[in-house]
């Protein structure tokens, strides 16, 4: 809990908090066993907010229960949403958005660390990761909470 509170500008209450997003982004380790590591900032019924670092390319997948807004804090890579033939690059300062059920992937990481600030509406259950190819992974191999 001490580390969690050290990443806040002021102590969290039941109704508000002020997070040091860049410090949280820098706190992720250099390597991970899963494709990404995830830090929940808020987890309300209407929405959740997270910071996560992507360590390896992510295979095509979707989220069945939430829309996702991804603000790129650092790094560069490629992504596609809906159509794998329409690959584009992402970089810090960009916002990616997709509705629930939209298949998406990050096929290539061009510059580490790739870190996103995510807002999910409604809240995202950590198990809500559905791989297009079930052999590509499970929620447990996809993400680990820190």
Where are these regions (language model features)?
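Short histidine-centered beta-strand/loop micro-motifs
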Residues: 40, 52, 59-64, 81, ...
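A short beta-strand-loop-beta hairpin characteristic of the jelly-roll/cupin
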Residues: 69-92, 129-131
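Conserved metal-binding segment of the jelly-roll/cupin
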Residues: 90-109, 119-121
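Short, conserved beta-strand element in jelly-roll/cupin
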Residues: 53-55, 64-79, 119-122
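Conserved hydrophobic/aromatic beta-strand scaffold that supports enzyme active sites
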Residues: 40, 49-53, 69, 87, ...
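Structural motif
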Residues: 48, 76-78, 103, 113
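A short, N-terminal "cap"/entry segment at the start of jelly-roll beta-barrel domains
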Residues: 1-51, 59-60, 131-146
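A generic "binding-loop/recognition-motif" signal
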Residues: 56, 65, 102-103, 112
């Amino acid at each position: 809990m001490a580390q969690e509170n050290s990443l806040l500008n002021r102590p969290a209450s039941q109704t508000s908090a002020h997070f040091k997003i860049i410090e949280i982004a820098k706190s992720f380790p250099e390597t991970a066993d899963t494709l990404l590591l995830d830090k929940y900032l808020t987890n309300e019924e209407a929405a959740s907010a997270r910071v996560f670092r992507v360590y390896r390319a992510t295979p095509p997948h979707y989220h069945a229960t939430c829309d996702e807004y991804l603000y790129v804090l650092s790094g560069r890579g490629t992504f596609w949403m809906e159509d794998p033939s329409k690959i584009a690059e992402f970089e810090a300062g960009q916002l990616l958005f997709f509705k629930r059920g939209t298949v998406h992937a990050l096929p290539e990481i061009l510059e580490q660390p790739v870190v996103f600030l995510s807002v999910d509406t409604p809240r995202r259950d950590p198990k809500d990761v559905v791989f297009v190819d079930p052999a590509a992974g499970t929620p447990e191999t996809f993400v680990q909470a820190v």
